[in-house]
């Protein structure tokens, strides 16, 4: 069975995260399997057959995010270098930003993404035989990153509150950690950042839960 935590990026009086029980578990079948995490599915499949115990997967993930999105401010500030690189620099950059300014930047970014998607659709229609690697070389990458701000899902500690905290009270046997690409620009800090994630999650889950660290099978199309 599979449960996917709603990917709510920001919560205020107008945007509320639905209670976790409203979402419900999905049974793995031909209709739902495409929604499953591939890594999680194969792990659950082999465990189910090897130890004959039903497996439930809870997906707490969002693509393009740093490890700093998944821990709270207290842990982000435990390490001075991580605090400087991931926390201080981000919030200093937006400290004078108004909500109207942020909303304007978000609208501009969405328009750039829309135009990019139109280019991709035209390219695929014109060159149906070409793969995604060639498309990226010819058309370019998706506009990234998005604008910084209080509503940015990549903000430090953001998804910790809007996603992880919604499920941390539920007991689990292990965490499959499949993240890190977004932190390559600060790779020298990643070991320390990951250690903080592990400590923070274990504290919130009230258990010395094991973390299974998954590597990317490949990082570059070339």
Predicted regions and their residues:
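Cell-envelope and extracellular/periplasmic
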Residues: 1-222
